[in-house]
Amino acid sequence: MRDQFISLALMLCVLHSACGLYFHISETERKCFIEEVPDETTVIVNYKVELYDPRSNGFMPSSPGIGMHVEVRDSDDKIVLSRVYSSQGRISFTSHTPGEHVICMYSNSTAWFSGAQLRVHLDIQVGEHAIDYANVAQKEKLTELQLRIRQLLDQVEQITKEQNYQRYREERFRHTSESTNSRVLWWSLAQTVVLVCMGFWQMRHLKSFFEAKKLV
């Protein structure tokens, strides 16, 4: 089974919006998406699976017997979530380490649907965009002003997380650059030492050769 990685460079910011798309897969295909997420950030994944109907030349919504296996791995390649869901659902998880989170999806379709083409609608929401404020206002009985203040506070918190994540990325990049420069320096020194040793050995060898031939 071949992984098809679709890199989604979705850096969070205040203007960051949800990512909505759809893609086609067969029964044996596996699609993976990369989402860069700060730590302690909520991610919501909404999806819907449709089965291709050759009679109507279209896709049937909510086909029975079709589900999706969803697996989420964090930046340390640890499994955050792995389970089988129905043909339509909403998945939620919270990141505990900053960095790239890989979201992989593949069909768990039975032999009845073997070889069929599927269309998967996918919507990924990160941070404040993953919060249903209408539901929050209803549950906590917030006024419009209180809800707006809550949204602003969440935005400030998300901006802080994003800034911390950017600093983390800059520090990691700096360490990588310093490590690369150090390796290049040591490799250059090693090459220089090898060349000097080879030159010295060749000179000794030539001197011995000339002495043996009584040319010097």
UniProtKB/Swiss-Prot annotation:
Short sequence motif Prevents secretion from ER: positions: 213-216
Lumenal side, ranges: 21-183
Keyword Transmembrane attached: yes
Membrane topology, record value: Single-pass type I membrane protein
Top-level lineage group: Eukaryota
InterPro entries in alphabetical order: Emp24-like (IPR015720), GOLD_dom (IPR009038)
Cytoplasmic-side segments: 204-216
Endpoints of the signal sequence: 1-20
Compartmental location: Endoplasmic reticulum membrane
Entry coiled-coil feature ranges: 134-164
Entry's transmembrane regions: 184-203
GO BP annotation list: dorsal/ventral pattern formation
Keywords for the protein's UniProt record, in alphabetical order: Coiled coil, Developmental protein, Endoplasmic reticulum, Membrane, Signal, Transmembrane, Transmembrane helix
Residues in GOLD domain copies: 30-126
A GO CC term assigned to this protein in UniProt: endoplasmic reticulum membrane
Role played: Eca and bai are essential, though not redundant, for dorsoventral patterning of the embryo. Specifically required during early embryogenesis for the activity of maternal tkv, while the zygotic tkv is not affected. Involved in Golgi organization.
Name assigned to this protein: Transmembrane emp24 domain-containing protein eca
Organism (species): Drosophila yakuba
